[in-house]
């Protein structure tokens, strides 16, 4: 298998952490340079038509996109240590916290960065006011998660 990743992007980092926690060693990793638009090349778009990272290319040539889908696939192949829960309560708690952190923290962080960082202006249209508001939401979420962890 081969994982297309990027050292500067948070979504592939989640998959890489998952792989490390599972102790999986047989996945080749190819890093794409987002700054050089390597994720927008025709070659990569054949793998991931939406140009998003990460992408996991399976040994049979199939492709899995999206962080959670990749992690769930790897969990099925490598069930130990279990990282998605073993009973209904664990599964629900893990899913709840993953969703909350994704929507309440990661999305505002991502939008704040994308809409306010000068480097990102070459990659997408920016709305500075929106970005600043998202950064405030992210800071509020970080304070909350600091208090509950």
What are these model-predicted stretches?
Residues 130-149:
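Amphipathic alpha-helical packing segments from all-alpha helical-bundle domains
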Residues 1-132, 136:
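GST-like domain detector, emphasizing the conserved glutathione-binding G-site
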